[in-house]
Amino acid sequence: MLRSLCSIAVRLGGARQPRLLSSAASGDGNDGKGAKDAIDEDLLNAIEGVANNIHPQNGSEKKSLKNTLINRLVANEKASFDAAAASASSEMLDDQALIGLLADVAGDAKVEKKLPPKSAQLRQEKRGLVLLRKEIFYQAVQSGFTTEEARVKSETIVNEAQIKLQEQRKALLNDVREKVEQEEVEETERSEKDQKLFTMALEFMEKIYKDDLISSAVRKPVKVDNDAIKLFNQKPLGIWKKGEKYEDFSLGFWKQWDERAARISNGSFGPTNSFEEQIEWTTKGKQWEYPIDNEFKMGDESNVSFIDHVFLERHLPSLGIPKSGPIAHFMHLVCVGLSKNPYMTAAKKREHLKWFADYFNTEKQKLVHKLHEQEQIAAQNAL
């Protein structure tokens, strides 16, 4: 009987959607999780019923049985949460981009390297920001936020951390410290979950950005030579009389590269509204472009005349088709059928005519003519 009642209690608890230990906190700030944090009211009522049925008179035995069942259910819930957290951690560790970024950060901490070019540094910073937003999004979902709230948190928190880091760098350059009281007020106003995510984003941000502005030994200042020739202050030589004919020329590769980087950075979280979603569908060819055109993406067929689709008999003499007889009558029917076909291109229709012309060669024409004469003679004799 105990086994059957325990199975009923477990089924009642499994029928409801389980709450993870990480998202079931009561909000009172205590680190320890009670029984109600992992077990709902229905399951507690089922356990109470099991204890009353087995030990209706003995209060100590009833309490001991309840504690045993609750401890086992909490242990089962904790095991499922640990398994989910382990799979999520393994998925994060399998991310090669994040591993490469952390490896670069660890290498920079151990070995002093030369400062990379400014363009490469900007690309690395953009790449690190995208990865950081993904990590904050994942951590926010694990903390109990919804998907939409996690997306907003990842954007706002990373932006706040970026602004905060820029202010700290400016303060170090100007030897000015920010007010400690203002920081304490901001930290107290921010909730516990937001503060945890903000601290993580700030730590990652400090590793992503290079401290080239702080270290004066990294880049030496360039002294301007005041005695150098100033090219823009010289008189024109007058070699080119008409300068309006000349235009600035630049490689389109760099413009395409910047547009591609912008698309990757902006599209990391997908479209934010239905308008951007429809724009994405239109660029991928999944939706009609406005204004609606029935000849959308016809290609070379848009330049083909209607005459080339309908009047096909004019091609028969050049293909060697006889002007009279059964073959001519058959090819006339072929041309009529092809002229009424709206799904074939004009070139494809001409290929069909050429195939029939190759089929009705000289030998086939003689054979058809002979069979036609024999049929006419047989018809006359039948009369």
UniProtKB/Swiss-Prot annotation:
The keyword Transit peptide applies. Keywords: Coiled coil, Mitochondrion, Ribonucleoprotein, Ribosomal protein, Transit peptide. Pfam families: MRP-S31. Residues 158-187 form a coiled coil. It is found in: Mitochondrion. Residues 1-21 form a transit peptide. The keyword DNA-binding does not apply. GO terms for molecular function: structural constituent of ribosome. PANTHER family: MITOCHONDRIAL RIBOSOMAL PROTEIN S31, SMALL RIBOSOMAL SUBUNIT PROTEIN MS31. Component of the mitochondrial ribosome small subunit (28S) which comprises a 12S rRNA and about 30 distinct proteins. Belongs to the mitochondrion-specific ribosomal protein mS31 family. This is Small ribosomal subunit protein mS31. It comes from Caenorhabditis elegans. The lineage of its organism: Eukaryota, Metazoa, Ecdysozoa, Nematoda, Chromadorea.
